[in-house]
Regions:
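Mid/C-terminal beta-alpha module of Rossmann-like enzyme folds, strongest
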Residues: 152-176
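Non-catalytic, hydrophobic alpha-helical segments
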Residues: 22, 142, 146, 162, ...
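NAD(P)H-binding glycine-rich loop region in Rossmannoid oxidoreductase-like domains
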Residues: 14-55, 63-71
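Active-site beta-alpha turn of Rossmann-fold NAD(P)-dependent dehydrogenases/reductases
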Residues: 26, 59-63, 98-100, 163
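Catalytic helix-loop patch of NAD(P)-dependent Rossmann-fold dehydrogenases
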Residues: 39-48, 64-104, 108
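N-terminal Rossmann NAD(P)H-binding glycine-rich loop of SDR-like oxidoreductase domains
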Residues: 1-17
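NAD(P)-dependent short-chain dehydrogenase/reductase
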Residues: 85, 89-134, 139-143, 147
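Catalytic phosphate/metal-binding cores of nucleic-acid and nucleotide-processing enzymes, i.e., regions
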Residues: 13-15, 19, 94, 138
């Protein structure tokens, strides 16, 4: 079962008919979001989905920013941590994957990668800090990693950080 229709949901399409797993890919995706209604909607959907499918393993995608002191007080990051805690209470069979900056064709226009691509295509001026960096994770790599974890079936009720082995300077991303 796949809940959602965005970049992650599309990548996990092969799980649509899976009767044992919920890929929850329908959450707040804009890391600059501050609207409480969006946060409540996600929590309510997780609650309803989990209650309607109590025997299925819940796969939830959170953010590595929870461990980043420079941003972990932002509403989005606080919300993701709150959802992680909520899942631990309402589900007895879950894995939470904390992701770095996800990239892939299509997806959220608010991600750093998609912002840079659209700005370049539209010939817009972009201010870039030469020492700023981002850890980019391709959605295909996310899918392959999660699929392997699920195939091994050795992890339950845990939080797993998924990120690239290195971060990239923003100028590197733009030039490449």
């Amino acid at each position: 079962m796949v809940v959602g229709s965005g970049l992650i949901a599309k990548a996990f399409h092969s799980f649509v008919d899976d009767e044992n797993i919920i890929i929850f890919a329908s959450g707040v995706s804009n890391s600059l979001e501050t609207d409480e209604k969006c946060f409540v909607r996600e929590k309510n959907l997780i609650n309803a989905t989990t209650k309607a499918n109590p025997s299925k393993k819940l796969i939830y995608f959170s953010t590595c920013s929870i461990d980043d002191q420079s941003v972990n007080s932002r509403p989005y990051v606080q919300h993701k941590k709150s959802i992680e805690d909520f899942i631990a209470v309402i589900s007895n069979n879950y894995i939470i994957f904390r992701l770095s900056n996800l990239v892939g064709k299509g997806g959220n226009k608010n991600t750093i990668f998609n912002y840079l691509v659209s700005s370049i295509k539209e010939n817009k001026t972009v201010n870039i800090w030469k020492n700023a960096s981002r850890n980019l994770l391709d959605v295909t790599d996310l899918y392959l990693a999660v699929r392997e974890v699920l195939k091994e079936d050795a992890i339950a009720n845990e939080v797993v950080n998924l990120a690239n082995t290195r971060s990239f300077l923003i100028p590197e991303i733009v030039i490449e």
